[in-house]
Each structure stands twice: as C-alpha cells, then as structure tokens.
Amino acid sequence: MVEPIFRVVDLRVTRGRSSIYDHRSEGSGKLVHIHFCASCGTKLYMTFERFEASCGVYAGTFDDPNWLQIGGGNAKHIFIEAARHETILPPGIPTFLQHAMTNDGTPQEPVIFEKPRVVGKGRTG
C-alpha cells in the first residue's frame, strides 16, 4: 500500500460520499478513520486522531497511481516488522520497524538499506 500523506485541508472528494470505519491503532492506541466509498466499499483515504491535520490517500484511488515520484526525500516504510512475507524494500528509503516516532513524538532513527532488502515473516501451515 502506497499512501501519500496530504494536509486534510487540501483533500476534496469530488464525487459520491464516503462512509467511515474507525480502527484503533495497536501502536499508538489512537483512532485511525478509514474513509471508504459508501456504494462499493473501496478504501479512499485515512484520517488520524493522532495527526489531525493529515490524511493518507490510498494510491489505487488516483487516476494515475504513478504520478507521485517516490524516493528517500519524500517516503518512508513503517511497521516493517509486520511486513507481508517476501516484501521487497527498495534501497535509499528510510525504514522503521514500527512507527517513525514514539507515542510522545520522539523521532525514531531510520534504517536505510543500500541494496533491495526482502523482509516479512514466513508463513506456516
């Protein structure tokens, strides 16, 4: 899931209406509000109790999901300890085992790989 982050004031839904599902983050204990299409159920974007001025837009909702160039200056991979089996992390992007900051706002030190790195726990059964 690629999730560009924008300011809430810059987001506009231009058609239809969304419904909201609230999910409590296991990491912060704060609510994550999942906004989805009321007609078809497609996830559109997220807003956050923890970061009230920000929203994360699901890349698959853009007409052209490749419009945003992703690199070390504008991207990060978080919660890589819970990554899907055989997830490939590209080089040069800051990565974090969990969130990029602690619950009190203290920034965490990223790990930046020089080569592509395969992560994720193997499946059993």
Language-model region placement:
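A short Gly-Trp-Pro
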Residues: 1-125
